[in-house]
């Protein structure tokens, strides 16, 4: 348990260092946000990529070569140097939590709230805009970042996650509540 907490703290420190580097030049804050988002996407789409970086018996030179092949010309040169530094310090296994922590730091700096919406069917742009506006009013955020996911098993409605708060307005959730009420009465 302690090792997980230590890793989390180390990842947070690396993300803070990345933020400090980003603040040193105009435009890097957003650029690094795009870079970390892209890296998270690559890790989501290719679990083998992340596994390759995590395995300790793979040579550091091979890990650096993979990073250059995957991200060279796609991320800012400072970011590529940062990734290679993580390899040198044997911290590249923390790439995902570092990227996630940086994204969280960036949202805080930009006063942006992250909301995840899981719906039974894809939301239209009008529905998404209306939802963003309601979340903005509810949280007093300057901006709202809406991540959408479709789960047909919800049957209808949606589940909205804003930070630690979960609003279950799905048909499946309503049926579950009704079933619970009927069994308790």
From Swiss-Prot:
InterPro entries: ATP_synth_OSCP/delta_N_sf, ATPase_OSCP/d_CS, ATPase_OSCP/dsu. The keyword DNA repair does not apply. One of its GO terms (molecular function) is proton-transporting ATP synthase activity, rotational mechanism. SUPFAM superfamilies: N-terminal domain of the delta subunit of the F1F0-ATP synthase. Keywords: ATP synthesis, Cell inner membrane, Cell membrane, CF(1), Hydrogen ion transport, Ion transport, Membrane, Transport. GO terms for biological process: proton motive force-driven ATP synthesis. The keyword Ion transport applies. Signal peptide: none annotated. One of its GO terms (cellular component) is proton-transporting ATP synthase complex. This is ATP synthase subunit delta. It comes from Gloeobacter violaceus (strain ATCC 29082 / PCC 7421).
């Amino acid at each position: 348990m302690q090792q997980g907490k230590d890793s989390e703290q180390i990842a947070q420190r690396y993300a803070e260092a990345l933020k400090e580097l980003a603040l040193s030049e105009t435009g890097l804050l957003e650029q690094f946000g795009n870079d970390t988002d892209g890296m998270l996407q690559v890790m989501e789409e290719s679990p083998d990529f992340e596994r390759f970086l995590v395995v300790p018996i793979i040579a550091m030179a091979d890990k650096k070569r993979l990073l250059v092949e995957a991200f060279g010309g796609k991320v800012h040169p400072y970011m590529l140097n940062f990734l290679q530094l993580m390899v040198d310090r044997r911290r590249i296994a923390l790439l995902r939590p570092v990227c996630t922590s940086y994204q969280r730091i960036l949202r805080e700096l930009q006063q942006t709230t992250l909301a995840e919406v899981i719906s039974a069917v894809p939301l239209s742009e009008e529905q998404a805009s209306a939802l963003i506006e309601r979340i903005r009013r509810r949280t007093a955020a300057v901006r709202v970042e809406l991540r959408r996911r479709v789960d047909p098993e919800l049957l209808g409605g949606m589940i909205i996650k804003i930070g630690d708060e979960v609003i279950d307005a799905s048909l499946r959730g309503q049926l579950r509540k009704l079933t619970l009420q009927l069994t308790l009465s």
